[in-house]
Amino acid sequence: MAPPAKRARRGLVPPGYKYLGPGNSLDQGEPTNPSDAAAKEHDEAYAAYLRSGKNPYLYFSPADQRFIDQTKDAKDWGGKIGHYFFRAKKAIAPVLTDTPDHPSTSRPTKPTKRSKPPPHIFINLAKKKKAGAGQVKRDNLAPMSDGAVQPDGGQPAVRNERATGSGNGSGGGGGGGSGGVGISTGTFNNQTEFKFLENGWVEITANSSRLVHLNMPESENYRRVVVNNMDKTAVNGNMALDDIHAQIVTPWSLVDANAWGVWFNPGDWQLIVNTMSELHLVSFEQEIFNVVLKTVSESATQPPTKVYNNDLTASLMVALDSNNTMPFTPAAMRSETLGFYPWKPTIPTPWRYYFQWDRTLIPSHTGTSGTPTNIYHGTDPDDVQFYTIENSVPVHLLRTGDEFATGTFFFDCKPCRLTHTWQTNRALGLPPFLNSLPQSEGATNFGDIGVQQDKRRGVTQMGNTNYITEATIMRPAEVGYSAPYYSFEASTQGPFKTPIAAGRGGAQTDENQAADGNPRYAFGRQHGQKTTTTGETPERFTYIAHQDTGRYPEGDWIQNINFNLPVTNDNVLLPTDPIGGKTGINYTNIFNTYGPLTALNNVPPVYPNGQIWDKEFDTDLKPRLHVNAPFVCQNNCPGQLFVKVAPNLTNEYDPDASANMSRIVTYSDFWWKGKLVFKAKLRASHTWNPIQQMSINVDNQFNYVPSNIGGMKIVYEKSQLAPRKLY
């Protein structure tokens, strides 16, 4: 008889928690809430202390401080009690200092003291301040500066470190100073870590770092800009060329890491799609550090010479919209996220958002008589919504050497499958019984059902006939749906192409065959285009999903009632039959079969250009799927991160003289890093046969390595090669 399974030690853990309390083991499963997750991290740190020969129970440690920071905004009673317990411990217990032989549970160890900066950096500064700047101490083991959970409305952490005579100059809130000049303030990490857990689960931690370059904005003003290309749509039949809209152009830039290529390299993605069956999005955190601000001046000589100087008093403005107050503007749909190459500097995209603008465009064709109805009406006063970051989101001011961390955001999303389905309606349920089986091998030897079609047993919905065939037998539901691909709907702000789930259609050049709806991506050098390509034309690819609706629209037909066998010409509507006497207009162009019986999978991850997560719509009736991203955040999503070089004015500034400020040309370089955590399920093999996996041939291998002058590209990879049954 097998010995009984050992139960995990519970310890003194209150109800509703797994790790919040002393004496429990570290294998209790997933934490129940953010406070419990902080407690688990705290327990792991304590275990590391004990292994190194230190007793954390008698001292106040950095792990205790991290727990205090992570639970400062806790809403649950256990988190509040734990928070105040360790605050009390902080007041009475001696301090325990982390050392390099004491590993953190969240990030690699680093020296706890920084070396002094080179003296020449502070020559000018020393004239104004006392000499002998002390070393700045820092807790390098704290995850993402403070590891604080970012709740709704939570405040990020800002650390301003000063190299002054006071020694340790760290503090919260905005501010400036010469701080960390010449001092390393972080790590550059682009590794993907795979931690294999129990029961076939894998924790995937994707680290990403980039050098970000930010110029000062062209203007410090918010501007309402209208795009008008009515000259294009004034020609009959050119409705799809419509670009008219209004947008608010802001002086801010958006740091957007919401694309697969920001986090995974091609080798990582190959490992994930070949070995795992589903992905769960767990948490996200990001940080800005090693801020550098410089001014640019130009000499009056010929030719002019540009001079670049560090400006220790200029500021970088940073704002985190943790409450999602501002319009949500994911940049992947415009291919404007952070770049995909870790060794290349990247830029944040200028932030702008749509403004309400009414537009009327009546459909026309080349044979239409008269001028098309082509009107833009302007903004309805009832719908005006003008957002500014300065009065909606807390803004932090960073100077050279300062840091900013968002804390940790925990996702609430449904998982994403990494397998595709092959079963369509014709492959659901029990196949018909065969009275005759083949007696020899060969493709020309078939089985035979044997029973006459009008004498078979089963269920149909035909009503007017007793014929039971593979075409007429009733299936449990409808797998996928047909949708008109080239369908444009009119809204009060103009026409738009209706999004559909990708299907398996026919040739896109045949008017009688529906296109498949697979997304087509256009992108530049930061996002996978061959870096030696010249000209302005972006590179493109069409992502042909394995997981589709299994449809074949050119084979559709509709039969008349009463149902007749065989069907005659006046009892059937074929894809090639015109509707309303219009040549080229048939029911596959306008027919939508989506309904309450429709079964459909989520959209696949598109590596590297696809969006990862999307925001849930603030509507009462919400869409079941989003076509841009496989993960849809419930209730809230990570706050957008905005940056801007603060105005660096000259003595000639006069607010009444001009709309343009008199500014010193200033730019910033800073380092950005983030951590995106997934949970994945290892794929088990349930079939005898091997399956197709993500691989490349010899010729394609050279797409992933640089040429002799550094030219390279990123080729998109499939994400759902492994098949699975759905019924």
Curated annotation (Swiss-Prot):
GO terms for biological process: adhesion receptor-mediated virion attachment to host cell; clathrin-dependent endocytosis of virus by host cell; entry receptor-mediated virion attachment to host cell; microtubule-dependent intracellular transport of viral material towards nucleus; symbiont entry into host cell via permeabilization of host membrane; viral penetration into host nucleus. Its main location: virion. Keywords: Capsid protein, Clathrin-mediated endocytosis of virus by host, Cytoplasmic inwards viral transport, Disulfide bond, Host nucleus, Host-virus interaction, Magnesium, Metal-binding, Microtubular inwards viral transport, T=1 icosahedral capsid protein, Viral attachment to host adhesion receptor, Viral attachment to host cell, Viral attachment to host entry receptor, Viral penetration into host cytoplasm, Viral penetration into host nucleus, Viral penetration via permeabilization of host membrane, Virion, Virus endocytosis by host, Virus entry into host cell. Mg(2+) binds at residue 323. It is found in: Virion; Host nucleus. It comes from the Viruses. Residues 25-35 have a biased composition (Polar residues). The keyword Phosphoprotein does not apply. Changing residue 244 to T: In strain: Y1. GO terms for cellular component: host cell; host cell nucleus; T=1 icosahedral viral capsid. A motif (Nuclear localization signal) lies at residues 4-13. Residues 1-39, 95-120, 141-184 are annotated as: Disordered. Residues 166-183 have a biased composition (Gly residues). Disulfide bonds join 633-637. Belongs to the parvoviridae capsid protein family. The N-terminus of VP1 is sequestered within the mature capsid. It contains a phospholipase A2-like region and nuclear localization signals that might be exposed by capsid modifications during virus entry. Capsid protein self-assembles to form an icosahedral capsid with a T=1 symmetry, about 22 nm in diameter, and consisting of 60 copies of two size variants of the capsid proteins, VP1 and VP2, which differ by the presence of an N-terminal extension in the minor protein VP1. The capsid encapsulates the genomic ssDNA. Capsid proteins are responsible for the attachment to host cell receptor TFRC. This attachment induces virion internalization predominantly through clathrin-endocytosis. This is Capsid protein VP1. It comes from Canine parvovirustype 2 (isolate Dog/United States/CPV-d/1988).
